[in-house]
Amino acid sequence: MKTSLQIIKFGGTSVGSGERIRHVANIIAHKLHDPGEAFPIVVVSAMSGVTDQLLRIARYACTGAHQDCEFELSALKQKHTEAAEKALHNHESRHSLLHDLETAFTSLTQDIHELQGTQTRELPLRTAAVAAWGERFSVLLVAAAAREIGIEAAHVYEEVIVTAYPQSETLQPLGTVIGADPLTEETRANVQRLIHPLIERRVVPVVPGFIGRTTTGFVTTLGRNGSDYSATVIGAALDCSEVSIYTDVDGVLSADPRIVANTRLLPQLSYAEAARLSWFGAKVLHPRTLIPIAHRNIPVRVRNTFRPHTRGTVVGPEKTQRSAAAAISVRHQLALITVENTDMFGAPENAGQVFALAARAGAAPVAICSSSGHHLSFMVEEQAASSVVALLQHDMGTWRVICQRGLAACACIGSGFSADPMSPARAIIALAHEHIPVITQGASEPGIILIIEDQDSERALRCLHRDLIAPVIPLVRHEARERKREAR
């Protein structure tokens, strides 16, 4: 009989210390021994802050700041040594883990030395090789902690599960990470070769998130915060029954709890709702996380590592019953670009031309606000606005280009928003009561988008949540609210 499988992925805060790594090992043990649970495959992030440390090390190595590089590397090694000493209590187990970490740091040092003499074109891949070590250190720690409490666990360390497209020729700023795209069939073959033999022996695989390897053999990465993405890529390749993302909140909340009091915990979301929330600024899921699993109807559950008994939020296929509202998120530092044909006549293909020019400038439209034969308005990241405007003015002939900066997109997401024709009016009235002007609005199935001044965004988030979300979603206790109360 085919074994039912699940992915359990732990983020950087979940493995942020030796004590937390022991706690993660106990969660793995519960999953393994509970007859109601599928067999677990563990995916881990780097310890909190480690990827940034590695990118600093890479930058120092490239710029010749050798003393700073050595200082950061020493601090990084100390961090993992301390985590190992607290995660493992058995002397022999700890000694073996420290030896494995020492070997890993020797390999990292070699990658740093190779980076120092790298030509400009090879910098992104050499930097990725350094940035990838955080997850590799984590799998050593988590697998060792699991073994110490009696779990048969093996780290998949030397080989990389996810195969990705080769990096493009486009140069990236120093200190950024590559966002490579996985190759489905090649990754599935890697899973069959590296993970299935462990599962057949009832050995729990512990694999690194974030990391890929190109078809040409270079280590690459799946983009900033890409461990969630790699978890669902591997989950799809294994045909898992569920992917659980363990983080430091109880699930997906109805708004940012740092700004809005009495946020609601959302028990479920559709794939479309979660994807739009992520696109418009919600931080719980990586924007690309749902791509590999949505067409397979594999649910994702967002759970709290530190309150593992809570059910969290399930993200899955479209709900049969539409909700009146789900959540509100804000994307900051945007610009509104309007392109107008001064003679009032335009061709349908002009929209395609505009977006092609925006893509050449390195900008993907965040939202489309209005479109007609002679008029098109869309939002882009503010930092890309000048390049987009320059290209449009150069290539669009008689078309007039207008740019308004300092804006934010306030996204009211939920299937009920798009089903209720009065939702936009209620949202605009709520903002009007707070004297917050709406610059323009757009549609984002499922939901509505309101463009406002960025300086008004926090007030807008509070009043929209108060008037649109709070009346229709019950208030329940969740961890974010309890932490806020304890901090008072």
What are these regions (language model features)?
Residues 242-246, 300-302, 366-367, 440:
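Short hydrophobic alpha-helical runs that function as membrane-insertion/retention elements
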Residues 150-155, 244, 301-302, 310, ...:
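Proline-centered turn/helix-capping motifs that create local helix->coil transitions or kinks
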Residues 296-310, 332:
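Active-site C-terminal subdomain of aminotransferase-like
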Residues 293:
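Acidic-aromatic/histidine active-site loop/patch
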Residues 311-488:
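A conserved regulatory-domain signal marking ACT and ACT-like small-molecule sensing domains
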Residues 151, 240-241, 298, 363, ...:
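Short glycine/serine/threonine/alanine-rich loop segments
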Residues 1-285, 290, 381, 451-453, ...:
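Nucleotide/pyrophosphate-binding catalytic subdomain
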